[in-house]
Amino acid sequence: MQGRRELGGEPLSDLQEEAASASLRVAPERLSDDSLEWRRTCPDLLLSDGKASISMPREGGSTCTARCPDPGEHSSTWGEFEGFRESSAKSGQFSQSLELLEGPTEPQPPRTTSAPKECSSHQPCQGGPWVTGTSAVPPSEPILSYENILKCAFQEITVQQAAEDVSTIDHFLEISSEEKPGVERVHKLCNESRKLWRALQSIHTTSTSQRLWSESRCQENFFLVLGIDAAQKNLSGGQGHIMEDCDLKEPEGLLTVSSFCLQHCKALIQTKLSGPPGSKQGRLMTCSRFLKTPSCGGGQHITIPRKRMFTPRKLKLTLFNSDVC
């Protein structure tokens, strides 16, 4: 009765928490692969201070102490505890882990280096020329670098360097296919274009160019290549005028120029048309070449209407790349 009163002084929740925290001890002598038996240790309740205390189990004993009450007793206070068993697979895994943790660590025997090994071509046997005492020194392996690997993979091939024989446009203009049979021409150059280009570079260009244009049989085709259509031009009454209703005179300095340098100036090709006053269409009389030079003041260029401007290189390519003959 006194024990019940002292137990009644403690709340039921505290007693249930202390009872639930009772430790479970595994009996290692009864572990097997099929089953794992758990035993519940019985707490010793010390009623002197009015609190329940749990005594730890002894080393050799796995059973409850003499003061441990029966599980069926005080069922209303402690509740009923039932034993449980786990499956054989889980218990086997758990027993193996416990054996590894609780079992003493046995020292492994030291490994001996006196085990016989097979001899190979790269590693000599014991007693070979590299053996000094009890330890064998491995042979020195060749040190491989990326440079050696690339040299072995991609071997160098000596190529004979030949001088490039690049023929310029002047070479094709001056030398014909008959003079050099080894050179095969893709496009046969026009003789009239060659004569005209040489005349433009000569000293007496004014008289020579007028004579060449008057004697040429490809004037109309060449003008069409340059974008000059003589049939659609407005006729001019005088040779000095460019158009009938225009009073602009051609500069006298340009008419008197006999030669010019192709490297420092640009060439102009001008068609001069003349015909009867009432006629709508005239015939092409002469064709002259003029310069485009900077004026004395302001650094501006003199521009003349009805004249198409070509650079020397463009004029040369237009002459020889177009089939005007």
Swiss-Prot record:
Q: Which GO terms describe its molecular function?
A: clathrin binding
Q: Where would you find the membrane-spanning parts of this chain?
A: none
Assigned GO CC terms? AP-1 adaptor complex; trans-Golgi network membrane
Region Disordered, as annotated, extends over 1-32, 51-79, 92-133
**Cross-referenced InterPro entries, in alphabetical order?**
Aftin-like, Clathrin-bd
Q: Where is the signal peptide?
A: none
**One biological process term in Gene Ontology:** intracellular transport
Q: Please, which domain of life does this record's source organism belong to?
A: Eukaryota
Q: What is this protein called?
A: Uncharacterized protein CLBA1
Q: Which organism is it from?
A: Homo sapiens (Human)
Q: Which gene encodes it?
A: CLBA1
